[in-house]
């Protein structure tokens, strides 16, 4: 079933900034456009936003719309997961392009861990995600999809997002 992801997920950008440097990064462009932080390559944590988790109505929160989970400071992760435990009514989504850079485990069942795959050479990220992050649920984002991904082992993957690159970049 096709669903517009913007209709079912609220962005909660607790951390803004990313060290990966993707040429097609919409987050970096938005940060520059709206002057959110001084240096996008140096992630910053905004703990005041944790209060957004106190909403009673269950929601789906994407916590990595402007960052990569693998490069979060461990102290930030501890604060965030503590607040998540206090607010189990929500689902929390985390996304990374570098699952090899993190080893993480949580007992929380309302945490969803995803990996971005944009080409066939990145398919191994899915297995790396399962090996390096334990807990909750898994998903894969094939977005933007630059080539034919081919056959993929989706064992344990509960959700798939497929999309194209947006914006005006030449050659996309």
Identify the residue ranges that each predicted region occupies.
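Conserved residues at the C-terminal ends of beta-strands
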Residues: 28, 116, 163
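An acidic- and aromatic-residue-enriched active-site/binding cleft used to recognize and process polar
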Residues: 97-99, 118, 145, 165
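Conserved C-terminal portion of the radical SAM core fold
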Residues: 124-171
């Amino acid at each position: 079933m096709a669903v517009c992801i913007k209709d079912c997920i609220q962005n909660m950008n607790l951390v803004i900034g990313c060290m990966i440097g993707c040429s097609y990064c919409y987050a970096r462009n938005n940060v520059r456009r709206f002057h959110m932080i001084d240096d996008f390559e140096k992630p910053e944590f905004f703990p005041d936003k944790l209060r957004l988790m106190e909403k009673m109505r269950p929601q789906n929160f994407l916590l990595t719309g402007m960052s990569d989970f693998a490069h979060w400071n461990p102290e930030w992760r501890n604060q965030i997961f503590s607040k998540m435990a206090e607010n189990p009514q929500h689902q929390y989504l985390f996304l990374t392009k570098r699952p090899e850079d993190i080893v993480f485990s949580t007992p929380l069942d309302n945490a969803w861990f995803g990996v971005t795959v944009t080409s066939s050479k990145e398919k191994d990220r899915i297995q790396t995600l399962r090996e390096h992050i334990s807990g909750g649920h898994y998903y894969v984002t094939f977005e933007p999809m630059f080539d034919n991904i081919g056959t993929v082992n989706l064992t344990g993957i509960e959700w798939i997002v497929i999309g194209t690159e947006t914006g005006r970049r030449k050659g996309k």
